[in-house]
Amino acid sequence: MSQRGRPRAFDRDTALQAAMRVFWERGYEQASLSELTAAMGINRPSLYAAFGDKAQLFREATALYQRTMNFTTPALARPTARAGIEAMLRDNVDAYCDPATPRGCLVVSVAAACPDEDSEMKTMLTSKLRTVGESVRQRLKQGVEAGELPADTDIGALAAYFETVLQGLSIQARTGASRQRLHRVVDCAMRVWDSLSGEPQKRPARQRSA
């Protein structure tokens, strides 16, 4: 019996991984269907059958990204809030500059370039970023409760500060900043913590590659 006309068999997870990388490298608007199908090794009918459309494919790709590239949650679980915040920043710097993957954070990069008129996409991306911000806020709250920070610390403002630093690190990495430079930014950010806590942390100099 002829096989002509039957949909091409493919591994959905592998195809989704490839799509995630295209979106990560190119962004949402810039990633064409031709680029996506070529990277995924499928044709357009197969893409539509398996994922619906480009927007739904992107939603699945960002969900995969968050499952596989989530360095924030384990970092914030460190024994102290200060150690958790610092690990969150440094671990993400290392991920943003990993030569094996595109630079920066997929969600931050696409959110920054997302046109305001695409309200559904913008809402989805900002919701993901707010989730990270809320995790940071909760960890800072625990730090205040544990006496790491003064009781009158403006937790909301401090959380927004570290969230801004985290997103800025992604943008800087995306535009070519070195790992070494970004770790120095983290050094500065943690001095803000120390100025609030009144207890400067003394650590041995770290050897970091550029």
How would you describe each model-predicted region?
Residues 2-4, 87-95, 130-145, 165, ...:
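C-terminal peripheral helix-coil segments that are non-catalytic and often amphipathic
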Residues 3, 14, 18-56, 60:
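Helix-turn-helix
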Residues 13, 17, 105-108:
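Short alpha-helical elements of helix-turn-helix
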Residues 60, 73-104, 155-162, 204:
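Hydrophobic alpha-helical connector segments
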Residues 63-69:
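Short, basic, alpha-helical segments at the C-terminal edge of helix-turn-helix-like DNA-binding modules
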Residues 74, 79, 83, 119-145, ...:
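Amphipathic alpha-helical packing segments from all-alpha helical-bundle domains
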Residues 84, 99-123:
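Amphipathic alpha-helical segments used for helix-helix packing
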Residues 103, 108, 153-172, 185-192:
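Hydrophobic alpha-helical segments that form the core
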